[in-house]
């Protein structure tokens, strides 16, 4: 079975034998309901460190719900109920002894629409460290610079740190939000369609940034853009009707999918 998608080019990477990467998130038999709506069904998925894992699928398939389950943001919806286990570094995130604030320190999130605070660029990045008790100005200065450099936007903003973040372009705002996420030194970065509101040039900058960030972080990205998933991810999960249909190396999923439904989706027969 060979599937092709117009203008989708998967990464051509030489296979090098390496030691297995550690599992960051291990999802076991996860089910989730919004009231009576069974949104996630028997999800089993392992996400590895220092990789970009893409989640694709049609609207309403459960991909954003799954992403928001990884840092328990989904619990902000009062009618949510879950069964099963998600282990982060071998610890069940649903365990009552695991403070959600601690989990979200390790697992940062970048949303679909850039959402800077109505503050200066500096204060946007320093906000998280301040909340965690850091008040020394020199330390905060260092964190702000390191985070903006990590988000590949320091050179653009270093002379504008006290300007309001609302004055930035959409692409700059999104990279500022990534810098704000980096400032709390997470282990994992969740991204919910982070480029869907951006122009092509800004999208390219964010994609290049993601490739750099995976050297130090594990990244899980939800995207409707199959070309983007093919360009930037190491593994891809295809969700459909709340189920994981297929989860494998990105190159394999886009060239030789093992499930007919995957082939139908990536070749545009539905979606």
UniProtKB/Swiss-Prot annotation:
Q: Where is the ABC transporter domain?
A: 25-266
Annotated EC: 7.3.2.1
A single Gene Ontology molecular function, please? ATPase-coupled phosphate ion transmembrane transporter activity
Concerning PROSITE patterns, the annotation shows: ABC_TRANSPORTER_1, ABC_TRANSPORTER_2, PSTB
> What's the name of the protein?
Phosphate import ATP-binding protein PstB
Give me the residues that bind ATP, please.
57-64
Q: How does it sit in the membrane?
A: Peripheral membrane protein
Family the entry assigns: Belongs to the ABC transporter superfamily. Phosphate importer (TC 3.A.1.7) family.
The protein's UniProt keywords, in alphabetical order, are: ATP-binding, Cell membrane, Membrane, Nucleotide-binding, Phosphate transport, Translocase, Transport
Tell me where in or outside the cell this protein is found. Cell membrane
ATP-binding as UniProt keyword: yes
NCBIfam families on file: 3a0107s01c2
GO CC terms of this entry: plasma membrane
Q: What is the lineage of its organism?
A: Bacteria, Bacillati, Bacillota, Bacilli, Bacillales
Which proteins does it associate with, and in what oligomeric form? The complex is composed of two ATP-binding proteins (PstB), two transmembrane proteins (PstC and PstA) and a solute-binding protein (PstS).
GO annotation (BP), single: phosphate ion transmembrane transport
The job of this chain, per UniProt, is described as: Part of the ABC transporter complex PstSACB involved in phosphate import. Responsible for energy coupling to the transport system.
Q: What class of enzyme is it?
A: translocase
Q: Which reaction does it catalyse?
A: phosphate(out) + ATP + H2O = ADP + 2 phosphate(in) + H(+)
